[in-house]
Each structure stands twice: as structure tokens, then as C-alpha cells.
Curated annotation (Swiss-Prot):
Similarity remark: Belongs to the ATPase C chain family.
Other information: Dicyclohexylcarbodiimide (DCDD) binding to the active glutamate residue inhibits ATPase in vitro.
Transmembrane segments: 6-26, 46-66
GO cellular component: plasma membrane; proton-transporting ATP synthase complex; proton-transporting two-sector ATPase complex, proton-transporting domain
Name this protein carries in UniProt: ATP synthase subunit c
HAMAP family according to UniProt: ATP_synth_c_bact (MF_01396)
Gene: atpE
Record-level Gene Ontology MF annotations: lipid binding; proton-transporting ATP synthase activity, rotational mechanism
Disulfide-bonded cysteines: none
PROSITE patterns: ATPASE_C
């Protein structure tokens, strides 16, 4: 059962990393196109990263309760 938890965490980390990378890359592209919007984009980026990380921490906590 421990091996499945490790596999689930590995897949979750992969998803979190990809999601954050895509988010930050698109924010950087948007800021390059419209530099005057950087403040609002930065706020949205921080909120987006927080939600993505929050999803990971929910999965991390749930792996301790399963099994």
C-alpha cells in the first residue's frame, strides 16, 4: 500500500509542477505583451499558484488517511 501512496504523490508532484510551470509561463508572456498589467497579473499568478499548491496539500493529507 505504501508503494501506491508514493506513486500517487509522484504523479501529484508532476501535475503540480506542470500546472505551475504553465501558469507562470503564460503570466510572463502576458506581462511581456502588456507591462502595465503586471501588478494584476502578479496577483492572479500568486492566487493561481496557491490554489495549485493547495490541491497538492489536500492530496498529501489524504494519502495519510487512506490505507
Amino acid at each position: 500500500m505504501l508503494n501506491l501512496k508514493i506513486l500517487a504523490l509522484g504523479i501529484a508532484v508532476l501535475g503540480v509542477s506542470l500546472g505551475e510551470g504553465i501558469l507562470v509561463a503564460n503570466i510572463a508572456k502576458s506581462a511581456a505583451r502588456q507591462p502595465e498589467m503586471y501588478g494584476k497579473l502578479q496577483t492572479l499568478m500568486i492566487m493561481g499558484v496557491a490554489f495549485i499548491e493547495g490541491t497538492f496539500f489536500v492530496l498529501l493529507a489524504s494519502t495519510f488517511f487512506v490505507g
